[in-house]
Design a protein with these regions (language model features):
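Membrane-interface interhelical loops and short amphipathic "cap" helices
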Residues: 4-28, 55-62, 86-108, 160-196, ...
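Membrane-interface helix-loop-helix modules in multi-pass inner-membrane proteins
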Residues: 73-143, 160, 457-461
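C-terminal substrate/ligand-recognition segments
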Residues: 389-452, 483-507
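Hydrophobic alpha-helical membrane-insertion segments
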Residues: 71-80, 142-165, 238-249, 359, ...
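Internal alpha-helical transmembrane segments
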Residues: 123-131, 136-142, 153-162, 182, ...
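Membrane-interfacial loop-to-helix junctions in multi-pass inner-membrane proteins
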Residues: 54-72, 98-104, 108, 128-146, ...
Length: 514
């Protein structure tokens, strides 16, 4: 491969759009299963711990009930996850070539270490109740959850590297980015923040699912004791996890402000930045338009919390937060350094692209290598032709962020209310609360998917931040072929989801063997 120029000259825009749509479809369906796996792992681990300590048959039956639901969901998550990983090679081969040496490492570790670990212990967890000691079985249950969490860690390390690429260098001889520090990649601050926020939010979803199913039992006046104990454990886990998710979300917002300021500007619909910026609670942001951002006015009817955006982005009430136009024009950071304008980044990106061509052609390699070392971090900007290409779709980012945060606050209130009524009153009586608990299940999924919409829409147009735009990362495939597989996957995934929901509902209706 000489450069990406030939691909960019011949690529069908439909190929890019359908490739993105197919990957988004697979990721959305996959993420319906993953957070419930992570969340239920904690719930069933706690219940089996109660059985191990008390040896009461009630806790054994309760743990086995939630483990059955965990197992159904786990199987679906594995199936969709395998398809998701294969799409990097089929639809995004240019990306795989460009950074495969780095991106492939955490995925390989996830498959070899974490997945095999959870696969081994999940078998003991399901089939070892009467074959191994109670202590070994308890350890297997917790290790299954740990394995699932480690899988999430390595996947999120890979995703975080795409949004904050560190620990690597570009080799013009091979036309590939190569890892220079595994620990920089694996332990980057972006990866740590993404992991803690994602996993704690998954615990919230698992707790919401537990409380929701238990409230359904209360509405039907079935398995009341299981429902009460499950609501107790689910609400405690949910409240703690919700508070942790809020805290880690604050840290994630701070990291985004430092590394992806355009994403933060899109989340806030902030066109003109400044000091002491307020955080918008709600504003009239048109959900159907993609305006000319250099001339767009601020959204009307903005209701905001004073100074809160500056606190999130800079941890200071007076901190400077750049808006869309500031980022495009260039601005001065808090540490006094100058962030180059889009025009300067484009020039340096084009210079890097030309230097790479000349290097590959054997022209003055030493000089061109120095240019690449200096300007490679702006390589992707050489493919940006218009300022509006640099701005992610603001309406989706704006509303998805508020949906996530608003529901997160609601979860804190509902879990706290559940615990209050559980300890002070009879939770089997207020039916409105039981319906509210049941509603937590879809609301938790909406919040979880909204968070990923912010993360992935917000980093556009980049596949790898500042290095590789989305349209330069795709495979040279026909848009018609990708469209066909998109609808094929849509039917397949919908059928899988329908089957899972059907099996889960049957198991829930059947209830525990008490």
């Amino acid at each position: 491969r000489e450069t990406m120029e030939n691909l960019l000259l011949t690529i069908d825009p439909g190929t890019v759009d359908w490739s993105r749509a197919q990957f988004a479809l697979t990721a959305i369906y996959h993420w319906l299963f993953v957070p419930l796996t992570l969340g239920l792992a904690v719930i069933m681990g706690i219940m089996e711990t109660c059985y191990y300590r008390t040896r009461k048959e009630f806790w054994r039956s309760a743990a086995q009930f939630w483990q059955r639901l965990f197992g159904i969901n786990f199987a679906m998550g594995v199936a969709t996850g395998i398809i998701l990983e294969f799409e990097f090679g089929t639809n995004w081969s240019n990306y795989s070539w460009f950074v495969g040496d780095i991106f492939g490492a955490p995925l390989a570790i996830e498959g070899i270490l974490a997945f095999f670990m959870e696969s081994t212990f999940v078998a003991i967890m399901f089939f070892g109740w009467s074959k191994v000691s109670a202590g070994f079985h308890l350890a297997s249950t917790w290790l299954t959850g740990l394995g699932a969490t480690l899988s999430a860690w390595w996947i999120l390390v890979a995703n975080a590297w795409m949004q904050y690429p560190i620990g690597c260098t570009f080799n013009p001889e091979t036309m590939r980015n190569e890892m220079t520090s595994f620990f920089d990649v694996a332990l980057s601050p972006f990866a740590i923040d993404k992991f803690t926020h994602t996993v704690t939010s998954a615990w919230v979803l698992g707790a919401a699912f537990t409380v929701g199913v238990s409230c359904w039992y209360l509405l039907r006046k079935r398995h009341v004791e299981l429902a009460k104990q499950s609501i107790k454990i689910g609400s405690i886990v949910g409240l703690v996890a919700s508070l942790l998710a809020a805290s880690t979300g604050h840290e994630s917002a701070y990291m985004v402000a430092q590394t992806q300021p355009m994403k933060l500007a899109a989340m806030e619909a902030l066109y003109e930045g400044g000091n002491s910026q307020s955080l918008t609670g709600i504003a009239m942001v048109n959900p159907f338009s993609q305006p000319d951002y250099m001339n767009e006015s601020e959204p009307p009817m903005r209701v905001a919390v004073p100074n809160m955006l500056s606190i999130l982005a800079t941890k200071s009430t007076t901190g400077y937060v750049p808006g869309v136009r500031d980022i495009i024009k260039g601005y001065t950071k808090a540490d006094g350094t100058k962030e180059p304008s889009l025009k300067e980044k484009q020039e340096r990106g084009k210079r890097a692209i030309q230097a790479l061509k000349d290097y590959r052609a054997g022209k003055d390699k030493e000089t061109n290598k120095k240019i690449l070392d200096s300007d490679m971090k702006y390589f992707g900007y050489g493919y940006i032709k218009d300022a509006n290409q640099l701005v992610p779709y603001i309406p989706i980012n704006f509303w998805a962020f508020r949906t996530m945060v608003g529901l997160g606050c609601l979860f804190i209130l509902v879990f706290a209310l559940m615990l209050f009524i559980l300890y002070r009153k009879d939770i089997t009586r207020p039916r409105w609360l039981q319906y509210l608990g049941l509603a937590l299940i879809p609301l938790a999924y909406i919040a979880s998917e909204s968070g990923w919409l912010v993360a992935e829409f917000g980093r556009q147009p980049w596949t790898i931040q500042d290095m590789l735009p989305t349209w330069a990362a795709v495979s040279d495939l026909s848009s018609g072929g990708i469209a066909f597989t998109f609808f094929l996957f849509l039917v397949l995934f919908t059928a899988m989801l329908t089957v899972e929901i059907s099996i889960m509902c049957k198991q829930i209706k059947k209830g525990p063997a008490l």
